[in-house]
């Protein structure tokens, strides 16, 4: 009877019914280890199916292996911040995808991120609120973004409520190269600002307005890993993540500083390529400007050798300094210091020439004064002519008439002509007579 019951059990009851049969009730001469390979596979399948129907805690083998951790946490681990977890150690598909990432059409990239083993990755409760995205967001990432520009807006007045997000928030594109990481960070920060998380992002001029919550940190870790695969991250980003794989804010802060540095580098290279000098400014100021640019570029990892630097400088010389383009073109080992030495020498010669010209130049006022002054060789005094023109009313006729009358008759009405004929003649008429031509 017992043997019939044993034969009625299917292989599915391998983990339950077979366990109730003792060794005394089984009468067989078959070696228990002598089992065919097909039987073993059937037993394994049956055991797996039976375990999947149970409501106990899932085995750790059902969770995908995390490449970033050698020994994953167990179900009994507790978070020092959020208290004990629920029975499930790993997040289910719904918990790992609370924001509806399937709308982006990339469900294969959603499951279990490298950050899920961190205690900070688990939400504090089963009903954590994340920004929900409508199904219309599932457009190809190559389409133009509705947000124009990559500039960072002031997010100090951004709403921190995670439940009320903007509509049509476009996700950042996928990072495909380490060289494009800084450009990708611009779009990622824009994505966080549109998701009402702009007040937790530091800028180049100020720190973050507030500290992020655990849910917000979970959201940052998940989206950062989702859109920036680890194989495309720069080395300095991997170094930060190796020390603390949840320190996304440090990565964003350092990226913003690098963006500011890159902007200065572009400005310095542009200034160096558009140099212009003609001697209108001191040579010391021109040398200091060029030297500061070269030092900044060298400190930022963009060294410029002497040959290239001299080419930039000589290209900007004009006027008399243009001669230095051809005077130094045969020197192979010419340095920037040698070129500036020639510029200083030419500038000093130019300034000395200007000073000499100003010394020998005659003053126009002095020339005008000399034209009106005559020196008498016989007499020590000089005679200066009257600068005013004679009155038109006393013409030549009147003066001639006065001379003729004074020669014919002498009287008290007329003054005698004093001095020699070579001296200036001055006539005085106390009656102030004005004669017209033809009246005498």
Swiss-Prot record:
Residues 299-401 are annotated as: RNA-binding. Residues 153-165 have a biased composition (Low complexity). It is found in: Cytoplasm. The record marks 401-402 as: Cleavage. Keywords: Cytoplasm, RNA-binding, Transposable element. Residues 363-372 have a biased composition (Basic and acidic residues). One of its GO terms (cellular component) is cytoplasm. It comes from the Eukaryota. Transmembrane segments: none annotated. Residues 1-86, 131-171, 350-425 are annotated as: Disordered. GO terms for biological process: viral translational frameshifting. One of its GO terms (molecular function) is RNA binding. Residues 1-23, 48-60, 71-86, 131-152, 373-412 have a biased composition (Polar residues). Induction: Ty1-NL1 is a weakly expressed element. Induced under amino acid starvation conditions by GCN4. InterPro entries: TYA. Homotrimer. Retrotransposons are mobile genetic entities that are able to replicate via an RNA intermediate and a reverse transcription step. In contrast to retroviruses, retrotransposons are non-infectious, lack an envelope and remain intracellular. Ty1 retrotransposons belong to the copia elements (pseudoviridae). Capsid protein (CA) is the structural component of the virus-like particle (VLP), forming the shell that encapsulates the retrotransposons dimeric RNA genome. The particles are assembled from trimer-clustered units and there are holes in the capsid shells that allow for the diffusion of macromolecules. CA also has nucleocapsid-like chaperone activity, promoting primer tRNA(i)-Met annealing to the multipartite primer-binding site (PBS), dimerization of Ty1 RNA and initiation of reverse transcription. The C-terminal RNA-binding region of CA is sufficient for all its nucleocapsid-like chaperone activities. This is Transposon Ty1-NL1 Gag polyprotein.
